[in-house]
Amino acid sequence: MRNLLAALALVVIGATSVFAIELDEVLAKAAAARGGEKAIKSISTLVQEGTMSMAQGMELNFTQTTKRPSKFRMDMSFQGMAITQAFDGTTAWSVNPMAGGKPEKAGSEEVKKMAEQADMDGELIDWQKKGYKLELVGTEDIDGSTAYKIKSTKDDETSFLYIDAVTWLLAKIDKKMSMMGQEAEVEMVFSNYQDVNGVQMPMLMEIRSDGQTMMSMSYSSVKANVDVPDARFAFPAEDGTKK
């Protein structure tokens, strides 16, 4: 009986080891397909410009600025109005003309979301240090292509990431997201990858819900390692001076 239990333990340990190796292999190939961790981490700033299209027919022009470590800013223009959301690594804030037009600091939930957007590498790079738990749960068909499905868990929140089995690039993320004031299960679909400073980046991201495209972001210009001062992300001074 003791020998049987020992044998079973070895089988379980062996299966766990193989599974861990499979996950590590997928992550390694995904990082290599993007250009490798060295190239990914060599990008210190990103300035991305493009158009955001909504299901209701609205279109907004935007400039998205990201800087290491943990700084993010999104500037949008719509019908002559300028809307800003930003995070300086500690404080998340926004300016919205439809909500009074004054800079306002955001709550803890918004800080958490903005911190995720400020992560230039994505959750699959240094995932353990960032507090994620990853599990390779199998494969799935994504628009006719096989993709590896990775379950990602952090702070009781779960999402699923799909890595294309041929290109090894991120094809899709399934997660919960706030849409028009309500939480919904959405698909974030990534396509049209192009080289930026030796790193493959998607030039198109679509957010789908119940099979319908709710929003798409098309990037027309992406510049890496441009000079962006930290003040660009800081909460505006009380006199309203724009930074």
Residue spans for each PLM region:
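Gly/Pro-enriched, hydrophobic low-complexity segments
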Residues: 79-81, 145-235
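Bacterial N-terminal signal peptides
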Residues: 7-17
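Short amphipathic beta-strand/extended segments with alternating polar/hydrophobic composition
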Residues: 61-65, 84-89, 102-111, 163, ...
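Positively charged n-region of N-terminal signal peptides that target proteins for export
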Residues: 1-7
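Residue-level detector of beta-strand face positions
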Residues: 47-51, 75, 93, 139, ...
